[in-house]
């Protein structure tokens, strides 16, 4: 019985892996991304807790709404992570962020189970990043960004991201609790790996922007 309960709670517990992702994002100066990860963790954990034994008291919203925000937070997390990787200049970065936030809200409201909820944000972001990097390569007449970005960030991050999506859409029927938990872990790892080492808009030294707990809690 104890093993069964532990297995049922696995998706809820594994949702907490987004906390380290939020912590890493905040440390690197990506405060907006950290808030999105925390938002995703909160609603994903509560959503899965409603499925768990004896945890229905945590369901402070309708199950359907919790599911919506769980999927929505995940899609937006993918979007802001890839935009951070692309290192777009302002105001393009802010405009693209809002574009993703608004379009994802409508798309996921229509269908929160199909491939398009994630393939749309990922495909659009990858296309924009590819165009930008190819333009930079043409200007520099060399590799852009540095080789280390491809080997240490893009390559490993994309591998974990692809693994997460495969687990989510193709293997969950094997054993939902374990597979979905590994999906959470793989997704969080992809966010951490794809995020640049430093946000150039966050400032440095005494001028560095800081994220406190009060601000972080405002996202929920």
Swiss-Prot record:
Membrane spanning stretches: 2-22, 38-58, 65-85, 94-110, 113-133, 154-174, 176-196
Q: What ranges does the Extracellular topological domain annotation cover? A: 1, 59-64, 111-112, 175
Q: Which GO CC annotations does the UniProt entry carry?
A: Golgi membrane; membrane; plasma membrane
- Pfam families for the chain: DUF3522
Disruption effect?
Answer: Homozygous knockout animals are viable. While, larval and early juvenile fish show no overt phenotype, adult animals are small and develop craniofacial deformities. Mutant embryos lack fast-twitch myoblast fusion at 24 hours post-fertilization (hpf). No alteration in the organization of slow-twitch myofibers, that do not fuse. In adults, fast-twitch musculature shows variably-sized hypotrophic fibers with variable degrees of fatty infiltration compared to wild-type siblings.
The answer, when asked if Lyase is one of the entry's keywords, is no
Q: What is its main location?
A: membrane
Q: Which residues lie on this side of the membrane: Cytoplasmic?
A: 23-37, 86-93, 134-153, 197-220
Write the record's keywords in alphabetical order, separated by commas: Cell membrane, Membrane, Myogenesis, Transmembrane, Transmembrane helix
Q: Where in the cell is it found?
A: Cell membrane
The way this protein sits in the membrane is described as: Multi-pass membrane protein
Q: Which GO terms describe its biological process?
A: muscle organ development; myoblast fusion; plasma membrane fusion; positive regulation of skeletal muscle hypertrophy; regulation of skeletal muscle fiber development
**Family, similarity comment:** Belongs to the TMEM8 family.
Q: What does it do?
A: Myoblast-specific protein that mediates myoblast fusion, an essential step for the formation of multi-nucleated muscle fibers. Actively participates in the membrane fusion reaction by mediating the mixing of cell membrane lipids (hemifusion) upstream of mymx.
PANTHER family the record matches: FIVE-SPAN TRANSMEMBRANE PROTEIN M83, POST-GPI ATTACHMENT TO PROTEINS FACTOR 6
For this entry, the protein name equals Protein myomaker
Report which gene this protein is encoded by.
Answer: mymk
């Amino acid at each position: 019985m104890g093993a069964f309960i532990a297995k049922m709670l696995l998706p809820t517990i594994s949702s907490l892996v987004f906390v380290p992702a939020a912590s890493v994002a905040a440390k690197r100066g990506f405060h907006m991304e950290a808030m999105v990860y925390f938002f995703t963790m909160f609603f994903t954990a509560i959503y899965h807790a409603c499925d768990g034994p004896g945890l229905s008291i945590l369901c402070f919203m309708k199950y359907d709404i919790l599911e919506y925000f769980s999927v929505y937070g995940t899609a937006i997390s993918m979007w802001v992570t890839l935009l951070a990787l692309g290192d777009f200049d302002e105001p393009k970065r802010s405009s693209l962020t809002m574009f993703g936030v608004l379009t994802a809200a409508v798309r996921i409201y229509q269908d929160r189970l199909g491939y398009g909820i994630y393939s749309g944000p990922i495909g659009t972001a990858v296309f924009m990043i590819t165009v930008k990097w190819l333009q930079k390569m043409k200007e520099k007449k060399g590799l852009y960004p540095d080789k280390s970005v491809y080997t240490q960030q893009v390559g490993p991050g994309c591998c974990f991201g692809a693994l997460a999506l495969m687990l989510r859409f193709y293997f969950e029927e094997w054993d939902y609790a374990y597979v979905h938990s590994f999906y959470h872990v793989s997704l969080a790892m992809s966010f951490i790996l794809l995020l640049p080492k430093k946000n150039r808009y966050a400032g440095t030294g005494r001028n560095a922007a800081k994220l406190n707990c009060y601000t972080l809690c405002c996202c929920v």
